Amino acid sequence: MNEYRFNAMGCEVVVRGGRADEQREVEQLFRDRDRTFSRFIPGSELNRVNEASGRPILVSGLFADTLAVALQVARETDGLVDPTLGAALEAAGYTRDFSELIADPRPAGPACGPRPVGLIGRIVRVPEGAILDLNGVVKSLAVDDALALLS
C-alpha cells in the first residue's frame, strides 16, 4: 500500500491508500484548514473572529459549519470539548505551533468552562475575553473530509 506523509496543523499526517493526485488533494485540504483555523497564522479566519471579541462578525460557510459542530460536541460532552478554551491554552504557554514549544514546568492554570458563543447562520459573536480554539474538531472533520477524497 502506498503511503504519503506531510506535516500540517502541528502534526504528521500519514495517508495510506488512494492515488497520488488524491493524496495531494488531502494534503491541500489539511493546509487550507490550517490557514483558516490556526491560532498561529496571522490573518487566519479564526484570528479575525477572535480579534472581533464581543462584536458580531460574518464568517465563511466552512467556519460557521465547523463552529456549529464544535458547539454541538461541547454540549454533548458537557464541556469536555470546549471551543472557548483558547485563553486558557495561551495562559498555559501554548502561544505558538506545538512543534516550536519547549517544555514548560509551570503548573496548569485554573479550570475554565465553556463560554456562550453566538452563531446565527454565518454571523458569529465570541464573548469578550474568550478565545476560540477549534483545533481538535477541525482535525477530526479534516480526516472525515480526507477519507471522502480517497478512492
What are these regions (language model features)?
Residues 139:
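Short, conserved phosphate/pyrophosphate- and ester-handling motifs at nucleotide-, phospho-/glycolipid
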